[in-house]
A protein has these predicted regions:
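A metal-dependent hydrolase metal-coordination microenvironment
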Residues: 1-113, 117, 123-133, 139-158, ...
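C-terminal functional module detector
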Residues: 1-10, 165-168, 174-290
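Short, conserved loop/helix-junction motifs that constitute active-site signature segments
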Residues: 131-132, 163-165
Length: 290
């Protein structure tokens, strides 16, 4: 079984960006222009507590979206819940009476793809990630959280959830605000023939996408317990799973493009990481053992 079919069209997109409609530094028009110039096929403008109603021309699809949040600033411990809704079909009117679960439920009711944004940056606890129900994905990488706060990676929470049988889809995003070093880094590549939200959303549901900072995952094939990976040249390809020791499933070399790994009985799932010579990464979604 191929998780996505080689040779099929892949669309590049960012599911998290801000503009002057909330706390971003550039206008909606300038945001769209810059992502278009950088070769993105689709974009979600996720201003805080505001739904952008969408836009499309021959070069880029801008999906209706917003980011909804509860910030517990000045409390001990200080933390936040930020949750994006992409493809939401109507405005969500949110105030501080909403619990984080209310936000998720509202996004799902509005038909949205619901992502828990930057939980490590937000100083969420792991238990809070468990207690929050029915969200679709977690940002494994968030550019602004990395370059301005040093807390951009949430892979640990993804693995800890998966080891407990809670499998979330994996995205990488920019969450761009300043548009200096916090843009055009984290993105997803989605297999869809047509650049429409309907096809992109279906591909997200079916895990026909991967997250990246630059490396490419050309193919992941699953044959029973065997996982076969083809990728752009890498210095390391590794498979993360629910077991502790990773030596057997970590492959180092110069310009590695192909690895094969058979899951032992003790491993219930795996996800693939491809790391290039510059340390940039690509991440697959979680592959659950049949």
């Amino acid at each position: 079984m191929d998780l996505w079919q080689p040779g099929k069209r892949l669309l590049k997109g960012n599911l998290h960006a801000h503009t002057t409609a909330s706390d971003g530094r550039i206008s909606i028009e300038e945001c769209i222009k810059r992502y278009k110039e950088h070769g993105y096929d689709f974009l979600a403008i996720t201003d805080h507590r505001k739904r952008f109603k969408g836009y499309q021309d021959e070069d880029i699809l801008v999906i209706p979206a917003g980011e909804y949040h509860r910030n517990f600033v000045g409390q001990a411990p200080e933390h936040a819940f930020h949750i994006t809704g992409v493809g939401i079909e109507y405005d969500i009117i949110q105030d501080d009476s909403f619990s984080p679960q209310d936000i998720v439920d509202a996004i799902k009711s509005a038909g949205g793809f619901c992502t828990l944004a930057h939980p490590i940056w937000s100083l969420m606890t792991f238990q809070q990630c468990i207690d929050l129900k029915n969200y679709d994905a977690i940002e494994i990488y968030n550019t602004i959280s990395d370059v301005y706060s040093g807390r951009g990676y949430s892979d640990l929470y993804i693995d800890m959830l998966a080891s407990r049988g809670i499998y979330k889809k994996i995205t990488a995003v920019d969450d761009a605000h300043h548009y200096d070093r916090d843009a055009f880094v984290g993105y997803i590549m989605v297999q869809a023939e047509n650049n429409t939200w309907e096809e992109i959303h279906q591909a997200l549901k079916e895990n026909r996408f991967y997250a990246s900072q630059g490396p490419q995952i050309h193919r992941i094939q699953v044959e029973g317990a065997k996982i076969i990976v083809d990728a752009s040249p890498a210095s390391c390809i590794r498979l993360m799973s629910n077991t502790l020791s990773g030596g057997r499933r970590t492959f180092y070399g110069e310009d590695i493009t192909h690895v094969e790994y058979t899951l032992p009985e003790s491993e219930r799932y795996a996800r693939v990481e491809v790391i290039d010579k510059n340390g940039l990464k690509a991440w697959s979604n979680i592959i659950v053992r049949e």
